[in-house]
Amino acid sequence: MRRTVSRKMGAGALVVGVAMGVYVGGTVGAIVGVLLAMIGFQALTRGVEGRPYIVTGLLTTAGLALIAWAHGLDAPEVGLGRSTWVHGIAIAVGIVVVVGVVIGIAGSIPRLQHLFADERITEVSGLETTRKALLDIPFGTVLIEEFAFRGVLLALGDVLWPLPWAVVWTSVLFGLWHISPALEMHDSHQATQGSSWTTVVGTVIFTGLSGVGFAILRLWTGSLFPPAALHWAANGTGVVVGWFVHRRLRRRTEYDPVGEREDPGHTD
């Protein structure tokens, strides 16, 4: 019942946010509309996976694009200018390869495997893991977050403040955006111990700093593709490697050669 109410409120916030962003004049009105739509998206998709999550992410991204269009932002200003597609995609591919190799190596080191011990993927099948890595994360998480924080909000912030302050501001928002996911991670990840608020504060700081890095990469390349690729590679590869780590650890636990041996001196 509570989750149903939360989703209804989220849907309302999403619709109102897009409408406000489109029809309310001024940059501040656009920013408030984007933030309200993002809050609505998070409330609407809490605990949701698969097609509903992806569709909601795509629709919300379309709503943010309407806000950007209504306030005169063009494709280059949000990191999607055609002139940047080729080199942006080339850099993105290189990032995916490098990050994938690094995370894969980290997952093979026993001392680092606890970093991938997420109970949310313990009982998940390989097919579900693949879907999450190739569909849910890129189209339901990365797309909307990068377009919102490194695309629309960064461009709108650049209108109000000097660019460095726009980077700081959007990165702080990106960190705060991860409060709810941090609480979920605390209950399911073996690498998080102690108070839940320790996890939240650590996550907000880490993702906020990551947001600065994503924004710098976006501005340096002029393209939204490289930060999106880095974001997806880190999350998607982490899920896949985590799944393999869980399988390996489970096999070690289930296989007990000592227990399987029979004592030759024992007779019934």
What are these model-predicted stretches?
Residues 8, 22-76, 87, 91, ...:
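Alpha-helical transmembrane segments in multi-pass membrane proteins
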Residues 38-45, 63-72, 102-107, 178, ...:
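Structural signal for membrane-spanning alpha-helices in multi-pass inner-membrane proteins
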Residues 33, 37, 55, 59-63, ...:
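Lipid-exposed faces of alpha-helical membrane segments in multi-pass integral membrane proteins
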Residues 10-11, 27-34, 53-57, 87-92, ...:
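Residue-level signature of transmembrane alpha-helical entry/exit and packing/kink sites
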Residues 80-82, 121-129, 159-161:
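Helix-boundary and loop/linker segments of multi-pass membrane transporters
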Residues 128-268:
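Transmembrane helix-loop-helix hairpins at the membrane interface
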Residues 74-81, 111-121, 154, 190:
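Membrane-interface helix termini and inter-helical loops of multi-pass transporters
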Residues 1-15:
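Short, Lys/Arg-rich, polar N-terminal cytosolic tail immediately upstream
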